[in-house]
Amino acid sequence: MAGYMVLIWDDEAAWDAAGEQDVEKTMRAHRDFGARYAHALRGGSRLYPSGTATSVRHDRAGITVTDGVFAETKEHIGGYYLFEAADLDQALGIAKAVPCPHGWVELRPVMPGSEYRPA
């Protein structure tokens, strides 16, 4: 089994404009997703809006801490799931089932620490 992470990219303005029924429908879909894939899930959570983010940048001059997200973009990471799958095809099947009515998901394999090799 290999580890995978799904990053859930959302349009925050669409969520702000969504009605309570739309929000509850999506949260119910996430609960159903969690129940359906409980055997594979290893973690996941909804994230607070991007306005609560703090960016920490490392460069030759040192470390800079700033309020807010690192880039100006319409979509922001609204949550994530961490799970295990037998292969990429199975991981894609799980990723396609992630509820995301106001955005898209990004699937990435998780690199085991034993495979990390600094350049």
Regions found by a protein language model. Give the residues of each.
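Conserved, structured core segments of small domains
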Residues: M1-A119
